[in-house]
């Protein structure tokens, strides 16, 4: 039996990864992290979607110690989310160590349940400049974690080279465009669906959706070229 663990926030990217995993694996688990994020509504969104999609198990882990250590606009309500980069060249929504911790804990969970893969929705095509979303980081951590566990757990990043429009096309390919559009929560201000429309996450999500809706065939063709999915299904 093929098993996978999806790092699941209840947002657009991780929900798209989850619906894809359900088509590829016999048993799918999801793990969600409570790190004291300002958009805490995403945890309840993840719970609701996990139940709705009928996965094998959904684990919510308390990792609020990350919020104590990592000062960010996502862990401090008094720090406004900004479009401007900081002096270090990173957005103020970067949470240092977040994906290091999340992927490591997800791998431990995968070890426990006998899963062969950990799936994460990180991407470096359309992304906010976070260093822990880069392909080279994920591959390096994957090697280290597999060595440390003495088990070949595979980190999968199905969205790594997709832009946001192509990610929308992928959700549509699996018949969940409306689910992702209406029920997921990507907004840094905790508003589901189309969100606040003003934060960087909403801007990226909205631009990708409009590009997809304006040229479904063209975007689906790009998705097909990159993944082998999309074009033939007519999404």
UniProtKB/Swiss-Prot annotation:
<comment type="similarity">
    <text>Belongs to the QueC family.</text>
</comment>
<keyword id="KW-0479">Metal-binding</keyword>
<keyword id="KW-0547">Nucleotide-binding</keyword>
<dbReference type="GO" id="GO:0008270">
    <property type="term" value="F:zinc ion binding"/>
</dbReference>
<comment type="function">
    <text>Catalyzes the ATP-dependent conversion of 7-carboxy-7-deazaguanine (CDG) to 7-cyano-7-deazaguanine (preQ(0)).</text>
</comment>
<keyword id="KW-0671">Queuosine biosynthesis</keyword>
<keyword id="KW-0436">Ligase</keyword>
<feature type="binding site">
    <location>
        <begin position="8"/>
        <end position="18"/>
    </location>
    <ligand>
        <name>ATP</name>
    </ligand>
</feature>
<dbReference type="InterPro" id="IPR014729">
    <property type="entry name" value="Rossmann-like_a/b/a_fold"/>
</dbReference>
<protein>
    <recommendedName>
        <fullName>7-cyano-7-deazaguanine synthase</fullName>
        <ecNumber>6.3.4.20</ecNumber>
    </recommendedName>
</protein>
<feature type="binding site">
    <location>
        <position position="187"/>
    </location>
    <ligand>
        <name>Zn(2+)</name>
    </ligand>
</feature>
<feature type="binding site">
    <location>
        <position position="199"/>
    </location>
    <ligand>
        <name>Zn(2+)</name>
    </ligand>
</feature>
<keyword id="KW-0067">ATP-binding</keyword>
<dbReference type="GO" id="GO:0008616">
    <property type="term" value="P:queuosine biosynthetic process"/>
</dbReference>
<keyword id="KW-0862">Zinc</keyword>
<dbReference type="GO" id="GO:0005524">
    <property type="term" value="F:ATP binding"/>
</dbReference>
<comment type="pathway">
    <text>Purine metabolism; 7-cyano-7-deazaguanine biosynthesis.</text>
</comment>
<dbReference type="GO" id="GO:0016879">
    <property type="term" value="F:ligase activity, forming carbon-nitrogen bonds"/>
</dbReference>
<feature type="binding site">
    <location>
        <position position="202"/>
    </location>
    <ligand>
        <name>Zn(2+)</name>
    </ligand>
</feature>
<dbReference type="Pfam" id="PF06508">
    <property type="entry name" value="QueC"/>
</dbReference>
<dbReference type="InterPro" id="IPR018317">
    <property type="entry name" value="QueC"/>
</dbReference>
<feature type="binding site">
    <location>
        <position position="196"/>
    </location>
    <ligand>
        <name>Zn(2+)</name>
    </ligand>
</feature>
């Amino acid at each position: 039996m093929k098993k996978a663990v999806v790092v699941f926030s209840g947002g657009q990217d991780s929900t798209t990864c989850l619906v894809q995993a359900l088509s590829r694996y016999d048993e799918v688990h999801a793990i969600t992290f409570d790190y004291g994020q300002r958009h805490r509504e995403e945890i309840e969104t993840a719970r609701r979607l996990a139940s709705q999609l009928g996965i094998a198990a959904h684990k919510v882990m308390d990792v609020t110690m990350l919020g104590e250590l990592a000062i960010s606009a996502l862990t401090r309500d008094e720090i406004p989310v900004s479009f401007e980069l900081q002096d270090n060249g990173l957005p103020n929504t970067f949470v240092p160590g977040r994906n290091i911790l999340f992927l490591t804990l997800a791998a431990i969970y995968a070890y426990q349940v006998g899963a062969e893969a950990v799936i994460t929705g990180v991407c470096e095509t359309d992304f906010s400049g976070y260093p822990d979303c880069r392909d080279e980081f994920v591959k390096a951590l994957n090697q280290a974690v597999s060595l440390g566990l003495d088990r070949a757990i595979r980190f999968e990043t199905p969205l790594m080279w997709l832009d946001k429009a192509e990610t929308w096309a992928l959700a549509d390919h699996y018949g969940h465009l409306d689910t992702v559009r209406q029920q997921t929560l990507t907004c840094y201000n905790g508003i589901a669906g189309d969100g606040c429309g003003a934060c960087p996450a909403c801007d990226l999500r909205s631009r990708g959706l409009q590009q997809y809706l304006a040229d479904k065939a063209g975007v689906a063709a790009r998705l097909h070229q990159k993944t082998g999915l999309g074009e033939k299904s007519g999404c």
